[in-house]
């Protein structure tokens, strides 16, 4: 009998470990950008901080770049090529280098990939909370945040749909009329505006100029709120939700980018088309179609390097203890996380993953977030 009990306990532990393996999970909110949870569908990127009181969802759209279509080659280069060769063969390398720099290069070094900004959700009264948990399930590309305020449990479920081209934010509470928050946009772009009307919040902006190349990319992001119970009001660039039972927020973004030499599209119409279609579906339909499409790609590869009880610990602890102990499942998790990031940042019909995949909080990212072919191609 004792052996049976031991076997049952070990079996339960193994089941728990397997269930947690392909999740990154944390017992605290993200304090900085690199700790936020990345969601993406190639076109849209989102970083989820998971703060109960002041949720920030930093947004990216794959075609938000500084500058505008331009030529980065110097037409004078060919004319000096012969002279540069002669100087090199004559042993005058310094002179050759100076001549080449003067006539082969331009003032531009490539345009920067830029952020859209952030959608912020302010929850009054949620400063003090308990039982906090957040995770990113890379088997279904869904992030979850849960916590308690008093005796009410709040849950946020977020995913960037591969099937429907939108970020879905689903808010629930286990007590009726308990959801109340303010939604607002922020952006670092100087030329920008935010309008709140009924259940819709709209951010419009123009990307920035760079290295004497004028700005041409226009962008728009919309957040539309649907509630069960309660009400939605607009006030001074914000949407205010009170006494709701369940809330779903549909978010998307688009630009006027058509291709590398054409920026003539209508970004507002693009966003409207996406969100009008999304609004026709239930939350469950959106979730199921997203998971189904994601798993068509993610499910192609399985990897099992073994299991250990370390899999039950939260991700930061596992990373810290990895050198000192055995956690083969963490290697599996990191391998699959790499696949998750590439699936989420590069899909057929979209732009290739850039130097930061699709996630970037800056107007001037490290190395501009550009396509550095010697690195991007090899690593991705």
Predicted segment positions?
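Bacterial Sec-dependent N-terminal signal peptides
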Residues: 1-20
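Aromatic-residue-lined binding/catalytic grooves and analogous aromatic/hydrophobic interfacial grooves
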Residues: 20-379
């Amino acid at each position: 009998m004792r052996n049976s009990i031991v076997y049952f306990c070990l079996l339960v532990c193994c089941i728990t470990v397997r269930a947690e393996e392909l999740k990154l999970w944390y017992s605290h909110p993200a304090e900085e950008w690199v700790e936020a949870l990345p969601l993406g569908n190639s076109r849209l990127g989102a970083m989820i901080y998971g703060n109960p009181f002041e949720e920030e969802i930093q947004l990216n759209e794959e075609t938000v770049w500084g500058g505008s279509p331009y030529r980065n080659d110097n037409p004078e280069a060919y004319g000096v090529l012969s002279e540069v060769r002669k100087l090199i063969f004559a042993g005058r390398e310094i002179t050759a280098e100076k001549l080449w720099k003067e006539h082969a290069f331009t003032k531009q070094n490539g345009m920067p990939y830029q952020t859209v900004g952030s959608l912020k959700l302010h929850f009054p009264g949620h400063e003090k909370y308990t039982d906090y948990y957040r995770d990113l399930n890379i088997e279904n590309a869904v992030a979850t945040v849960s916590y308690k305020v008093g005796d009410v449990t709040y849950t946020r479920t977020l995913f960037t749909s591969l099937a429907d081209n939108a970020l879905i934010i689903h808010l629930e509470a286990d007590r009726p009329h308990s959801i109340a928050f303010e939604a607002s946009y922020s952006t670092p772009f100087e030329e920008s505006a935010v309008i709140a009307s009924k259940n819709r919040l709209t951010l419009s902006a123009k990307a920035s100029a760079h290295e004497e190349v004028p700005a041409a990319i226009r962008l728009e992001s919309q957040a539309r709120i649907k509630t069960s119970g309660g009400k939605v009001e607009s006030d001074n660039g914000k949407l205010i939700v009170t006494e709701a039972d369940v809330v779903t927020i549909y978010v998307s973004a688009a630009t006027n980018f058509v291709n590398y030499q054409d920026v003539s599209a209508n970004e507002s119409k693009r966003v409207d088309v996406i969100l009008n279609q999304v609004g026709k579906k239930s939350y469950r339909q959106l979730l199921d179609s997203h998971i189904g499409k994601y798993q068509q790609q993610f499910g192609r590869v399985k990897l099992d390097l073994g299991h250990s009880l370390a899999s039950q610990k939260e991700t930061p602890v596992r990373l810290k203890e990895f050198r000192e102990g055995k956690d083969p499942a963490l290697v599996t998790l990191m391998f699959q996380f790499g696949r998750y990031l590439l699936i989420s940042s590069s899909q057929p019909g979209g732009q290739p993953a850039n130097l930061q995949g699709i996630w970037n909080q800056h107007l001037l990212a490290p190395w501009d977030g550009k396509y550095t072919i010697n690195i991007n191609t090899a690593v991705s």
